[in-house]
Swiss-Prot record:
Ca(2+) 2 binds at residues 267, 323, 325, 331. This is Myoferlin. Ca(2+) 3 binds at residues 1028, 1034, 1090, 1092. It comes from Xenopus tropicalis. Residues 1845-1858 have a biased composition (Basic and acidic residues). Belongs to the ferlin family. It is found in: Cell membrane; Nucleus membrane; Cytoplasmic vesicle membrane.
Amino acid sequence: MISYEPPPSAISNPTDPGGTTIIQGDGENDEEEDRDIVDAGFNPSVPGAPGQTDTQIARRLVKGKKTRRILSNKPQDFQIRIRVIEGRQLPGNNIKPVVKVSVGGQTHRTRIKRGNNPYFDEIFFYNVNMTPLELLDESVIFRLFNSGSIRADSLIGEFKLDVGYIYDEPGHAVMRKWVLLNDPDDSSSGAKGYLKVSMFVVGTGDEPPVEKRDREMEDDDVESNLLLPAGVALRWVTFFLKIYRAEDIPQMDDAFAQTVKEIFGADSDKKNLVDPFVEVSFAGKKVCTNRIEKNANPEWNQAVNLQIKFPSMCENIKLTVYDWDRLTKNDAVGTTCLSLSKIAASGGEIEEYDSTGTGSSSLEATTEKEVGFLPTFGPCYLNLYGSPREYTGFPDPYDDLNFGKGEGVAYRGRVLVELTTKLDNSSIKKIEDISSDDILVVEKYQRRRKYCLCAVFHSATMIQDIGEAIQFEVSIGNYGNKFDSTCKPLASTTQYSRPIFDGNYYYYLPWSFTKPVVTLTSYWEDISHRLDIVNILIAMTDRLQSNISTLKSAIQAKLPDVRLAEIWMRLIDQLIEDTMRPMPSLEGKANVTVLDKQRDKLRQTSLKYIQEAAIKMRGEATDVKATLTEIEDWLDRLQQLSEEPQNSMPDVIIWMIRAEKRLAYARVPAHQVLFSKTSEEACGKYCGKTQTVFLQYPLDKTKGLKIPTELRVNIWLGLSEVEKKFNSYSEGTFSVYAEMYENQALLLGKWGTTGLLKRHKFSDVTGSIKLKRESFLPPKGWEWEDDWKVDPERSLLTEADAGHTEFTDEIFENEARYPGGEWKKADETFTDANGEKSASPSDLSCPFGWIWDDDGWMRDINRAVDENGWEYGLTIPPDSKPKSWVAAEKMYHTNRRRRLVRKRKKDPKVSTTSKAALTPQEQEGWEYAALIGWKFHITPRSSDTFRRRRWRRKMAPSDQHGAAAIFKLEGALGTDMTEDEEKKGSEKQTATNVFGANTPIVSCTFDKFYTYHLRCYIYQARGLTPLDKDSFSDPYAHVSFLHRSKTTETIRSTLNPTWDQTLIFNTIDIYGDPHAVAQNPPNVVIEIFDYDQVGKDEFLGRSVCMPMVKLNPEVDIAPKLLWYPVMNSNKHCGDLLLAAELIIREKDGSNLPILPSQRAPQIYMVPQGIRPVVQLTAIEILTWGLRNMKSYQLASVTSPSLIVECGGEIVETAVIKNLKKTPNFYSSVLFMKVLLPKDEMYVPPIIIKIVDHRPFGRKPVVGQCTIECLEEFRCDPYLTKHEDAPELRVARLTSSPLRDVVIEVEDTKPLLANQLQEKEEEVVDWWSKYYASTGETEKCGQYIQKGYTTLKVYKCELENVSEFRGLTDFCDTFKLYRGKAEDSDDPSVVGEFKGSFRIYPLPDDPNIPYPPRQFLELPGTESQECIVRIYIVRGIDLQPKDNNGLCDPYIKITLNKKVIEDRDHYIPNTLNPLFGRMYELSCFLPQEKDLKISVYDYDTLTRDEKVGETTIDLENRFLSRFGSHCGLPQTYCISGINQWRDQLTPTQILQNFARLKSSPPPVFSDNGTRLTFSSKDYTLEEFENNRKIHQHLGPPNERLALYVLRTQGLVPEHVETRTLYSTFQPNISQGKLEMWVDVFPKSLGPPGPPFNITPRKAKKYVLRVIVWNTKDVILDEKSITGEEMSDIYVKGWIPGNEENKQKTDVHYRSLDGEGNFNWRFVFPFEYLPAEQLCIVSKKEHFWSLDKTEFKLPPKLILQIWDNDKFSLDDYLGFVELDLHRTTIPAKVPEKCSFNLLDQDKHSKVASLFEQKSMKGWWPCHAEKDGKRILAGKIEMTLEVLNEKDAEERPAGKGRDEPNMNPKLDPPNRPDTSFLWFTNPCKTMKFIIWRRFKWVFIGLIILLLVLLFLGVFFYSLPGYVSMKIVKPNL
């Protein structure tokens, strides 16, 4: 299918109010193109979020649409670059994070880091080759793991987004943004940290933007720099996707098993051979419904629940219906998508209009809240499209279509779904059943209405695949599909017709005045409330698009401002009128969904904004051109508003069927042909109108190389209740017939039914279905109008002369003899070509409508015959005629014959519609065939054995009249069934339906036709593709219009042919209303071919033009020639300048314009008034020379000359005798006078050919070039200013005022000055200048404060800087091409032409003198020896070449045969090397002009790989007047790092510049502080007014001269950024180089000293950390006595130097979290003060050959641990300090709180490098239950010393010697601080006694008391008894 959009220069057809665009609509394709547009989301809880959050989101919703539509469907090279910079706030304790990044099946990971805020700064490259649409569907997945965990839960968090999201960002890049990580499996979890990343999508020819790494400018506030702004909070939402049911699922399984069941008597169901289930996928998650076996209309009634973070970075919810297979993989039935950007709105879409500055702001701010809504959809059906429905049992060649890859060619069912979104993160099932209440609710959305469709086929032309008869089928859904048995048989197919020749090249179907009609009824939901609005918005969009095209044409044509303002005002007024028109209301509609209401609200609000913005623009705009951007934004917005995601009505599909096989198709969106009773605007664009439809092959691999056919079809679709409205749209008279064929066979010389074999006496057209007259029953509502009649189908019986205007009749004269006898007349004297007996030539008459073109029959001797035309043969029995013939007579020959021919031509007096009277034989209506199934013909032959004739019976409607009666044709006409067949009634019915034999035949008869006259003015083409080996083509064009075509003449050996030809189609009969034809005229299709003498002509391209229709020829409107694109396989292959006009013609042709003049017989030129107006023009050609000419036919190009062609004029240079020695032309200027069009749009190109003069007179074309745009070479020859005069453009070749220049440099500086300079160079160097220029002021030291100047850093190549005009101001470089373009590739470059052109008008009066010549006083063409200095600063983002994702780059310089391979200075393991190298070599220009700088990857064992290369044209830099050979610095310095390096002083350069400008020399005064130049006065004071004067400056006159030079637009001192390219991925950046080149001609003396750009060396520093005390440390252990305690020690290191970890001794038994240490850590490190980064060099693995250098920010990590002797130590907490932004500590521990570590802007920080030392308390933190807690406080002294200070003030680690600066005494720890089992006595004293002493004392007292009591009670009885015995004792 071809869709065509006019170029911006095209104008609208004055008789076509609908514009000039004929586009075959394609709803599914649009959906595919837009389905990748990135969703930016919406958060209803934050409607008024700060900043422009919603606006940014809305722009993401909008902006993808513009870029996506221009994407190719051809696989291309792409490169995705992902840079992982750093992490922040990662959860976990003592983690070792690693990031894995996955894109398109490729995964890369970072190095393992330590800590919760790791710094990675690693870049990954992903090279892919796929189509852009496939690429944009790919996902980028960031996964963060804890590498120290071996558990399954090592995943910390992840983040996903589509590649399409990145592609839609400015520059296709997301730079230095934070992404929020979350747990994909736990919706209740919060943020899992942040990653800062940069992402780029680099396509062919794209330049990735350069990252700016400004530490001061970079925002460390994560929330404000999130990829999704903080105002739109990420929330967990649940998508409830309810999948109710599906219908019309096609057969997917083989019927073999069902057939076996049937054999054994089991039930079978062949209609439901499919086991469907639905797979839902979104953002990497997939959920499947249940499988329902053997059901083509399954009901799942299940809800899929998808929990995601919203707004989502992924766009499409993809639904794929699969057929389950037990043994093989599941087959896809079809795929459809829900695009979030279409079913949700953020509310920011409206705000974007205000941001443009012209929008209105009348709506309240709450409008955003009102129009924003979460994703919602349905209940609504989603249609599935894919491969054809017919099941074959073989692998489906179109299976990719079922996965949504490409445009589906057939309807494959539909799925009823509903989507709702809830702000809920509760864990629920992934899939659950839908409640019965919900199933009942959805019933009202399934109510069906009857729709009627009628399609009238007006023409089918441009057919090239001929053979079998052709018919067309129209279907909508399954209705009308002739191969499907699920619907009633309908009159959905046309009759079979055979194509006939159009007399020139194509074939067409001869429908004449009887047009085939198809009609069908179908049942769908009434969604008119959606489609009415869609059609209204589309009409509005089309009008705006047409008006914009008219406005652009007017701007391009440079119309007066007044006329321009009128066109613009008409556009604005039309837009305001359109947007003010009310939209249809949704009130009262039964099946309105939530999405309908929300989109209606969004549309109403958007239209109001556009309306108010247009009103405001109308009153305020002053510049028409400046408003175009905003108007086009409105157009984009309207196009988005016109999209309808809930379009459940399937497309109308037209199939071209040949031999019962589907050949080609076209899809027409139903809404385009739908009738609406709402209003005329709400009707479809082509409803009831004849439109042009180009069919296309399914999955066409040739991408439109051949058009199957061009259809003109009128389609009407409407509800059955309004079917009578069809009467007002219909034209002609509709006729309905039932038909059958009577068959007979020839048996024993008689015709009868005996030998029919399996054929029936009466059958359908295929002969396979038996029919009887009596069994035909008219459909309900119809009745017979007539009896059965014989009615032959003439369109199937075309003769050989059909369609020809000239034809040659032939007849053979036959003679026979016995061998050796005399020749006599044969029995059958005259026969035709088939050997059938024929009448004699004298008896043959000319057929009706033809006249003889010559006098009589002539012998044909242009064959393999003798001089009399005879050819001879031998008859061998049983044959009666010879099988072969020869030209020479032999004795044994028995037969001879000769061919008699006579030409005839069409009789112009006989109308094409006139027909001859039928003979009696023809009236019988029989058509004959040699065998059953063979092609039929009218005239009987002796070899015929089968014949048939068609019987037809006309029907008429019984209860209603008018064209709408055809919609009653529903159901079968009836068939005859035998008893056996009745047993298989269902199968017979299926077969009948399959062949469609019992459906009525509908046709539309036109009683009247109109004769038109077409003139196609083909003027010229440009930029065609070369298809011949000589680098050119021989183009000619076939021009097709309806059933006629003509061919232009062939133009030899050109890619820019000028045909200047008018093709006249004298009489073309078109049936239908002329006004309808004027509104939608047929297309003029031009196909351009390359003529080849041998082989088939090759297709160059196709162009489509809309003719201007003149219904009133008296109206004096001439068509305008316009450029139309020539397309081949969706590739632009040139342009064609043409116009066409279609004039309604009177019978006698009296109203036609006069014929144009003839250039040759029957070749008419383009007439005056249409052809361009020309003017005598001078073209001066500067032919400077040829470069880099490649060999031709294995021989070098040695003696070339140059030919210039333009407008039919040719000039040629002299021959270069030896190209290698003298590549320049001896005579450099050519002059030619040409008649060129005044309008720049019509100017022909300049063609350059290079001819090599070789021995023996051979002059092959060895290269050619076409210059299409000549406007840049136009000039005013009388211009008095001479800044741009060519003779003034050479500043170097003639810039020496003196022949010898001697520069003497004496070292007269005192010793002290030299010492001062050396010291200064330690403070500032060239890198200081570089970083000051790039804005990285933190790296440049005191450079700016000293008053030094900066240089210019260009982010592109110097020649691409716009103000330097490509450095081609003296001469341009034109690429020369040669050869044939194959496989859609461009021809190869075989050389370069150095030259230029000057084009200016010449006076028409020969007496007026010609203007002065432009190319004068040219420099000499001799060679120049030069010194070249190449400075390589650094590489940026080089393509990795090693397995570790890095490379080892080094520089290789190539200049002709000179090579510098700097392999020894490779830089290991980096993608961003700092080279800092300067190379110097000499060369001769122009022979050695191409300087090639390559970057290679160093490999020890294998061959070094090339990363990429860039090439610099030194000749252009040398010749350019912009002084690009050596950039001018800002100041003139005679010493220091900015010392002058050019050969000439500023005053000398200024004198040369004045001479080249033809200005007076500069005059100095006031001791060189005042200068007069070009009539302007300059003073030194005005340039140095606020500038600091330093000791390195030169004399005042030189400084002033330099300041003046810098005002003249010359190249400043600079560093350019050059992109590296590789042949592996051409046109895709492989990285960049920052560098510059100086070129010094040796004739001017030696240059100044070069710059020293050697990279800086890191300095050694020492960080001393004294850990004094800790406090409030978490008590992690319990002692044996039950006390909480910790054995505290502190561990510390600098990131990158983990192998130098240090730790204190252990403070045992801390009972209150206090620890005393007095311990010193000493961390040596290498540091770059200027860049504020640490340099770490170490081997990544033990097997690594080189150390890898890392640059890391200086940080200190300290951790507090609890010591365990018998288990692993316990981690308690940590603190991480940035030495550049060190948190100011608290002086006392009471003020040391957790707030000190908050990363906000109010934190007090200081640089330790500036403060040198700081002391105080810092808080440590840990994580517990997902929250950060205070883990303790640590008192430290931090001190940074350089190497010298460290040596002067030594200090040892810990408390080792030298223990000084300061001296650390052992800590005064409590007596309880010791290891308990090493000191039992201390354990008893300090642990047991201290805690249990009172227990012990109590126990002793208790023991004594008990002992006393025991003794007492022991001795008491004895004492008592003794007292009793001896009381007196």
